Amino acid sequence: MVVAVKGPYTSKPRPALVVQADLFNPTHASVTICPITSDCVDAPLFRVTLPPGDRTGLTTASQVMVDKIVSVPRPAVVREVGRCDPAYLDLIDEALCRWLDL
């Protein structure tokens, strides 16, 4: 799920991808996310590019920053803005496994 998250360094909510297991989403005090940036770089091993559109809720091509995985307090997640297609989730899963050496 693509969400808008309020961070400590900006007043404007930023997009992020929830990577935490659905089992823990309703009950845990924090949510594990990978931030999403529109500042795309050539790093296919740990940055997955998502397309803009109604499905993702993104206005421009953006990258999931697997290398910046973090847990944030549940109240920091402002709202859901979109969803990620299964093919992209598979790429993100592979990148997470690679980054975390799982």
Regions found by a protein language model. Give the residues of each.
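Conserved functional hotspots at enzyme active or ligand-binding sites that engage polyanionic ligands
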Residues: 1-102
